[in-house]
Amino acid sequence: MKIRNSAWLVILLFLCALWPSAAQNFADIKPSPQQVDWQDLEIGAIFHFGTSTFLDREWGDGTADPSVFNPPDVDADEWIRAAKAAGAKYVVLVAKHHDGFCLWPSALTDYGVKSSPWKGGKGDLVAEVAEAAHRNGLKFGIYLSPWDRHDPRYNHAPEYDKYYFGQLDELASRYGELEEFWMDGAGSGGHVYDFDKIIERLRMWQPNTLVFADVALYRYADLRWVGNEDGQVPYENWDVVDRSGYLRWRPAEADTPLRKLHWFWHPNDEASLKSVTELLGDYEQSVGRGAQLMLGIAPDRNGRVPEVDVRRLEEFGDAVGKRYAHNLVKEKGASLAASEALDGDPGTFWAAPEGSRRAVVEVHFKEPVTFDRAVTMEWLVDGQRVRKYAVEVFEDGKWKPVARGQAIGHKKIDVFPPVRARQVRLDLLETTGAARIREFQLYSSAAAN
């Protein structure tokens, strides 16, 4: 009987080891160094440019003649400067969209810039944008659509996989370090890709690149789509998610086009340009909820970002800078403890006592201050530890909450009606492990006007 019981125990332990959730705990999931660095970038830009730009299309069907692609004045440095003015620290170029048209001279197909009149068929737009990004201090990434509406090999999965592998080799080996590699699952229908080999091939060339994928491809993702193209995420946004039966660190990227209706440039579309107010809302509901904001920028048929778009990007960048220029905690506050969380330096952090499951960061002011925004940042190297928190002010002899939440993550911006107080605290009501707080900051939006 003892032997039988022991055997069953061994089998049970073996089965538990095979069951992913049994061995996993939310608090045990940590990001890679690359993910931590990526989350610090906060804002990115993605460029859509191709034959669709010249044909007033959004999704090309793969039938466009390459001769339509002939921009007379491509200025990749201008593209990058426009993105940088908005606060972007990385860019992604759509090297091949669903229509199959290649913005680099691929040796595997004639359907691309090498068959166009642009630069006599000798141009390489991927190289131009990559080099411009690096010149201007931005990181560079590539979008390579799995769906290809032009190439006949697409209807034969093994042949198309070889084609896709080859294009991946070209892009991953020629243009320097890639910060991000976008895989878009749109439109593929019943086509079956060998994604295991695709990722293996990518890692051979780019071991540190981060893979972005939408819902259908979460298994392969280091970064995840938020499920919309509005540039916003839910108020509670967790970096640790379960999409395939196991927990994994998958920070979110919230993408949205600068012109609300389209990703590619279209004539007479200026009216859909997002306002500064809308863009600030996107920022506070993406970056301000622990995600990245990815802005879609569409160069026109000249190969330039339209002037009105450039101005809007500049206005947005200026507006973010002004709204978050004056951290009242750093400028006017005095802490009782936790000074590393109040020093305005995201490179430092305050650690709650080991073993604690609740902690408080408190700040006092000599005179009452008025504020309507609280910014909190976790030190994510050790994981996302805060599970419940409140921002509180001391009023009429007791602490009163002005904001309550659960997830903090990389950055949480809580927005509330203006409040005036001399004592403010961040009450970390529930944590999984001792909290690690990089920053607790207070701002008044009125000061930016």
Predicted regions and their residues:
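Short, conserved beta-strand segments of beta-strand-rich sandwich/propeller modules, principally
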Residues: 373, 423-425
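Mature catalytic domains of secreted/periplasmic carbohydrate-active enzymes
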Residues: 23-343, 349-357, 362-364, 370, ...
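Short beta-strand-plus-loop segments that form exposed binding edges in beta-rich domains
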Residues: 427-433
